[in-house]
Amino acid sequence: MVIGRSNNHVFEFLSDFNNFEKLMPAQVTDWKSDGNSCSFNIQNMATLGMRFDTRTPNSHILIKSDGKVPFGFDLQCFIEPVDDNSCKTRLEFNADLNPMLMMMASKPLSNFINILAVKLKEVCEAN
């Protein structure tokens, strides 16, 4: 998705978990964060924790599962400049799910990531 802000702006926003609360859908409760990690509950699903693993300035962020989580996962944020005032951003979620959990959780997780992406565009372009 193309966001009408520079890759630096989007990278800086995504580099602080305190900003992620603005991206969370209504189903997320019990949000806790500091700059480098967060935890939250997705209603009727699970409590998840995340932490930053690697950050490549203005282009890539790797976030990994953290703490007691029902499955291991990572979230990658790819950010490519389009021009000085816009960038192409892609969120990629990978989860280590057994086949049964995959059937139950894949659609809600996909919806969750899609909501994050839409809200990321809205919030970044509004600021």
Language-model features: locations:
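Hydrophobic pocket/interface hotspot
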Residues: 10-14, 20, 52, 63, ...
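A short, structured loop/turn motif at beta-sheet edges
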Residues: 7, 53-58, 79-88
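Beta-strand/loop substructures that line and gate deep hydrophobic ligand-binding cavities in soluble
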Residues: 67-118
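Preference for bulky hydrophobic residues occupying beta-strand positions
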Residues: 1, 40, 50, 63, ...
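Short, highly charged C-terminal tails/helix-capping segments
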Residues: 121-127
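Glycine-rich portal/gate segments that line the openings of hydrophobic small-molecule binding cavities
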Residues: 22, 27, 31-70
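Hydrophobic ligand-binding cavity/cleft-lining segments
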Residues: 1-32
